[in-house]
Design a protein with these regions (language model features):
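Hydrophobic, aromatic-enriched alpha-helical segments typical of multi-pass transmembrane helices
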Residues: 1-191
């Protein structure tokens, strides 16, 4: 277990998988309370836990992408990996700040009063960042090419859909699917 367990490839994959697990818990809490239909959380503590899992998912994704960048830094995909990791980090800082400020404002009683511009910037940065990560995976040849292509197509496709769609574009699930796929592939490849 020793050397493979502590490899950067295994570590990056594990952190990316954990990011999806954190998102899943937060999204499940949101779904249980009927958040999609505008349902309020039962308590403020419940709301804090729900949003904290979403925040944790963003932080873990940023860490996982940074580890992936370190793995790819000396490959043909090194530049795109670095651009992707840094862009996601910048976007992540913005959405964590937006989520954290929502904790202080209460239970989203009037979400129109909340400043979600940082979350919108996060959405664009996260999609572009992960498209760059997909390109870096294609250039590096570390994982099967379909993973790189799927990452590029998924993220550019959502970006184009958001350009057409009006209204709320902050759907955290969108930004954690491909990191999960990449994470599983990295862990499988490392073992």
């Amino acid at each position: 277990m020793g050397e493979r367990f502590w490899s950067i490839e295994f570590s990056a994959g594990t952190v990316l998988i954990l990011s999806f697990a954190a998102l899943f818990v937060g999204a499940l809490m949101y779904w249980i309370r009927g958040g999609i239909r505008g349902g309020a959380p039962p308590t403020h503590v419940y709301f804090v836990w729900e949003r904290s899992f979403i925040i944790a998912a963003v932080v873990l994704t940023a860490l996982g992408l940074a580890l992936l960048e370190a793995l790819l830094q000396n490959s043909a995909g090194g530049v795109l990996a670095r651009v992707g990791a840094i862009a996601y980090l910048f976007g992540g800082v913005l959405v964590v700040a937006a989520e954290a400020s929502s904790l202080n404002q209460g239970l989203h009683k009037n979400s129109s009063e909340q400043n979600w511009a940082p979350a919108t910037i996060y959405v664009v940065l996260a999609l572009l960042a992960q498209a760059a990560i997909g390109g870096s995976l294609l250039q590096a040849g570390l994982l099967p090419p379909w993973i790189g292509w799927a990452t590029v197509v998924w993220n550019i496709g959502w970006l184009l859909a958001y350009l057409i769609k009006r209204g709320d574009i902050y759907i955290p699930f969108v930004h954690h699917v491909m990191p999960l796929v990449i994470g599983i592939a990295l862990v499988t490849h490392a073992t």
